[in-house]
Amino acid sequence: MAKQHWKGSTLLGPLPAVMVSCGTPEHPNILTVAWTGILNTQPPRTYIAVRPERYSYGLIRESGEFTLNLTPESLTRAADFCGMYTGAKINKFEKCGLTPEAGVAVSCPSIAECPMSLECRVTQV
């Protein structure tokens, strides 16, 4: 089979879908992000890609914090829901039956049902 040459694009995949929690304890939000990964180990750096027109973009930009929650198979439907609807109009934690858990180093909540959560501070936009 001959090697194919394609134009530059977003062709790498599949990428892990994660549920990103943001906002405040009083007004928490969740968005599902597939564009995420590790940038560096020392110092530890990760990234997420969120379009500026998304509701969560403003929340993250304003607070400078978010929590990256690894999504188990049991939360597939919740992850799908959180990727399809805006948190500007509904509380996704309530709609999906998820539990906001207070952050340790950030003010935004994590998702208690997720097996691992990475509390993050924005260093570059």
Stretches found by the model and what they are:
Residues 1-33, 37-125:
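Active-site-proximal mixed secondary-structure blocks
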